[in-house]
Amino acid sequence: MDKNEDVEIEYWCNGNKRSEVHYNCNGKEEGLRTDWYESGAKEREAHYKNGIAEGLRTDWYESGAKKMECRNKTWEDRVGNTYTNLHGKKTEWYESGAKKSECKYSTGRITGIANTWYESGQIEFEIPFKIGV
């Protein structure tokens, strides 16, 4: 493991990068975190703010095909509790590139229509969601 001020890099036994994590002055994850498969293919990119997942996260299959993309949002309630949840569109794909599922989140709860597809492209489910119901 290399540590250079605010960046920590870990390696697989074969010498390929395993992860690269940036830290703020308080020692908490800050900014982009990247993880790789042992083969060297990128596995995940996620953004952090003060140690909490915040913003875009993208995952890939080892083949390089996009697997999942979503956003996290952090907020604080009236008594100072901090919450991080999915917020916005979340999309998943089959390794072939065909869309697998798509739904929208609002502060961690599915809202609107959630869709799932078979790998052939045929719709599997279309489920409406409404917050509070």
Residue ranges and their predicted role:
Residues 1-133:
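Glycine/tyrosine- and acidic-biased, solvent-exposed loop/turn segments at the edges of beta-strands
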